[in-house]
């Protein structure tokens, strides 16, 4: 009886551990806007990666001139893998059912440049979008912003 009770407790703990691991891994599969994994989402690297990828560029054309010195991912294969994660899961920023360079790509780029309110949205939200206000779009984009590492603010 005692052995059976211990085994069932062990079984429950194992299930809890596996459930937590599966949940944790599924969260990691979404990706974030820090495409090159340098610890921050930057308009001139990550934003341009997303824009170029949205236009259909791949390989060297995708990464040419955009790899920064602090990038963890430095090859087209690495960058494309990271882009595919965020593109498939969250690339449709305005919620119109499509990932489009001239809407979603420009929204992300503008956001990463620090634009907000009407300057973020004017002229780039699709007519059939479900997220149309600046606050909706800013909220959606901000959910995938990476946390800034401590060294990011070192002077």
Where are these regions (language model features)?
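Cellulosome-associated attachment modules in secreted, modular CAZymes
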Residues: 23-155
């Amino acid at each position: 009886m005692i052995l059976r009770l211990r085994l069932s407790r062990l079984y429950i703990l194992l299930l809890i551990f596996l459930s937590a691991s599966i949940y944790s891994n599924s969260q990691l599969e979404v990706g974030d806007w820090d495409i090159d994994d340098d610890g921050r989402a930057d308009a001139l690297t990550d934003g341009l990666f997303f824009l170029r990828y949205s236009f259909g560029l791949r390989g060297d054309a995708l990464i040419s001139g955009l790899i920064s010195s602090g990038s963890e991912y430095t090859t087209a294969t690495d960058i494309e893998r990271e882009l595919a994660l965020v593109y498939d899961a969250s690339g449709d920023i305005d919620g119109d059912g499509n990932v489009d360079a001239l809407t979603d790509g420009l929204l992300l780029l503008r956001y990463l440049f620090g634009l907000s309110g009407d300057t973020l949205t004017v002229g780039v939200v699709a007519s059939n979008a479900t997220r149309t206000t600046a606050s909706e779009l800013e909220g959606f984009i901000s959910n995938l912003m990476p946390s800034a590492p401590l060294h990011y603010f070192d002077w």
